[in-house]
Amino acid sequence: APGSWSQYLSEKSKNSKILSIDLKDIEKIHNVTHLIGDFLDEKNQTIISNFFEDKLDLIVSDMAVNTTGNKNLDAISTGELSINAMEFSVRNLKKDGSFVSKIFMGSTFNEIVENCKKNFKEVKVYKPPSSRKDSKESFIICKKIR
């Protein structure tokens, strides 16, 4: 559901400054500032960077394209979103910060993992037990910028 990561992070880190961005409005979440807009718009990335006074501890990307039914095309498009979020993270995370992103298994999967390994010291791919077996959805967890 839209905002589920924000909801989770709000509950787990009560004293943190949290900002979410989505193309659509989401239900108000305690301790979360929500920005309606496209993350790929550089203006919005500047707004996000300026919202925080310092580099960040954690950046989470749950972005995905609207699915087309073509699983490989969807994986490629969502992979591009993940790479964009990873590049933003490299510029905005503290040296020991972490980046988590949704990714889909597909033709660009290895490229995304390699890209993350070039920028982070620790990289793991995680498929939640709650994810359906036939789902191509996974998460990449990256820690400590190189």
Locations of the language-model features?
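A short glycine-rich, Lys/Arg-flanked "PGG" loop and its adjoining helix->strand segment in the class I
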Residues: 77-95
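Glycine/threonine-rich flexible loop motifs
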Residues: 67-78
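Conserved SAM-binding loop of SAM-dependent methyltransferases across substrates and taxa
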Residues: 1-14
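Class I S-adenosylmethionine-dependent transferase superfamily signal
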Residues: 9, 48, 85-89, 116
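S-adenosyl-L-methionine
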Residues: 15, 21-68
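Class I S-adenosyl-L-methionine
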Residues: 105-146
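Short strand-turn motif at the edge of the Rossmann-like AdoMet-binding core
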Residues: 23, 63-64, 102-105, 128-129
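Short glycine-dipeptide loop
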Residues: 14-16, 92-98
